[in-house]
């Protein structure tokens, strides 16, 4: 005699406890919620820190993005140049030539024009010119060119 009904073990395997996985029983307890929020906060903090570093410490132009220059990370250092370094920058007198008179030159810090015979400082890495007083004040707090942001720091190892 063969029975067509499943054995008791087989029926136990197929038996489903619906109320065991019901959504109404799903609860987030205090400790789990605390750890989930702490993990989310840590991930958010590191994401914002990475974004800040990429925006403020890495070069903005794609040309220098992969270049291995010692000036790449000097922009991250806070503070300006030493007074001796500021005094060592070259000073030139402004001379108007006829070709330059059509194109008005001005100091991008104070937006004032350069007058004939006025003293200007030239920043060596980029050759940008500024009024001596303007760029001296700038370089006391910053170590980069005000216009192109290239580092002005002199490498002490050379």
UniProtKB/Swiss-Prot annotation:
Chief localization: membrane
Zinc finger (RING-type): 107-149
SUPFAM superfamilies on file: RING/U-box (SSF57850)
Pathway terms, separated by semicolons: Protein modification; protein ubiquitination
Membrane topology: Single-pass membrane protein
Catalyzed reaction equations: S-ubiquitinyl-[E2 ubiquitin-conjugating enzyme]-L-cysteine + [acceptor protein]-L-lysine = [E2 ubiquitin-conjugating enzyme]-L-cysteine + N(6)-ubiquitinyl-[acceptor protein]-L-lysine
GO CC annotations on file: membrane
EC number, UniProt record: 2.3.2.27
Biological processes per GO annotation: protein ubiquitination
Keywords, alphabetical: Membrane, Metal-binding, Transferase, Transmembrane, Transmembrane helix, Ubl conjugation pathway, Zinc, Zinc-finger
Location in the cell: Membrane
A GO MF label: transferase activity
Transmembrane segments: 33-53
Superkingdom to which the source organism belongs: Eukaryota
Keyword field contains Zinc: yes
Family annotation (InterPro entries): ATL1/ATL16-like, Znf_RING, Znf_RING/FYVE/PHD
Name of one Pfam family that matches: zf-RING_2
Record CDD domains: RING-H2_RNF6-like
Enzyme class (EC, first level): transferase
Domain notes: The RING-type zinc finger domain mediates binding to an E2 ubiquitin-conjugating enzyme.
Family: Belongs to the RING-type zinc finger family. ATL subfamily.
The protein, known as: RING-H2 finger protein ATL66
Species per Swiss-Prot/TrEMBL record: Arabidopsis thaliana
């Amino acid at each position: 005699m063969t029975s067509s009904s499943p054995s008791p073990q087989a029926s136990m395997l197929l038996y489903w406890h619906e109320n065991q996985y019901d959504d109404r029983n799903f609860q987030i307890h205090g400790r789990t919620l605390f750890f989930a929020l702490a993990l989310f906060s840590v991930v958010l903090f590191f994401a914002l820190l990475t974004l800040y570093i990429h925006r403020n410490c890495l070069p903005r132009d794609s040309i220098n993005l992969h270049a291995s220059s010692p000036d790449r990370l000097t922009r991250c250092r806070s503070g300006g140049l030493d007074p001796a370094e500021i005094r060592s920058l070259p000073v030139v007198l402004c001379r108007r030539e006829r070709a330059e008179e059509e194109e008005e030159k001005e100091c991008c810090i104070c937006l004032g024009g350069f007058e004939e015979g006025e003293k200007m400082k030239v920043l060596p890495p980029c050759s940008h010119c500024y009024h001596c007083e303007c760029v001296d004040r700038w370089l006391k707090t910053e170590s980069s060119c005000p216009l192109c942001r290239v580092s002005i720091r002199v490498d002490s190892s050379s």
